[in-house]
Amino acid sequence: HTLTGINGSSQQRFEQFDLNVAVTRLNLFGISADNANLHIARLRNDWEATISSADINGKIAIPDDLENGTVTLNFDRLKIISNQSGEDNSRIDPGKIPRLHMVIDDFSTNDLNLGKMIVKTTKIKNGISIDTIRFMKPDLQISGAGHWRKEDGIDDSQFNLDLRANDLAAMLETFGYSKAAIEEGETSMNLAARWFGTPMDFSLGNVNGTLNLDIKKGQFLNLQPTAGRLFGLLSLQTLPRRLALDFSDLFDKGFSFDQINGNFTLEDGNAYTNNLFMRGPSADIIVSGRTGIQSHDYDQIVTITPQVSRSLPVASDLFGPVGV
């Protein structure tokens, strides 16, 4: 069965309306669910739909005047599987999407759980403006804004996103990199990106824009012993760790760093940088060149500057003056 006609004239025809139905397949405002229980009721000047299934649990309030009103979604949980309906995202016209206000306590897309989600949109010419988009977990926060337009049949999406994570390893695990050889690392990122496609078509391999990165105090894991570790052992910057008998950054965990930062230009499936900088207790490392996001290849120059000047005073104390 198909329910239609929820518009301005429906108020006169449905002063009282209450319907419970079990559906094998539900698609409502782009949200799909299998084997869902749907309750539709008339409340004052709104329609209220309550949805319950394995992947969705919550309520949608739909105003009579979709052109000027706001559709409100309050969900306990929502899990979206890409292309689960087999529909082509390019067939969606963002200019026909009503104003939205969404609050979802537990949001997942595919196997990616992003915690609580808040989205607020307004209508613009040929599309929608995403005025607010936020994802919140205890160790990860993402916030930003953007827009989605369709002109002459071509989708155009543009977003600016800020990401904050208390632990880089936990963030990478959230995004599916559970075997990332890194630990700790307070992370800040800013992504300004544009791509031809819908917001659901986003991937780093198909966007143009910029990515700014800053990571503080982390460790690369499972590195083999190298001469660089000796400088790390002797570095003045890590002397407080040594006095506390803390050698975990050298032996137990791998190679530690104090800061990593850099700026990338994203273009045609590649990321370009001339200032990716890592400062560690044993060396400064600068990387410039290209990373192939889609082709998984590299064309880079890596410059390593050992922290000899910072390490020699400690070395002198331990091994005697130079030349002795």
Q: Which ranges hold each PLM region?
A:
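N-terminal leader/targeting segments and the immediate start of mature chains
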Residues: 2-14, 89-94
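Small-residue helix/turn framework positions
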Residues: 16-29, 39, 48-57, 63-113, ...
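A short, compositionally biased
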Residues: 43-45
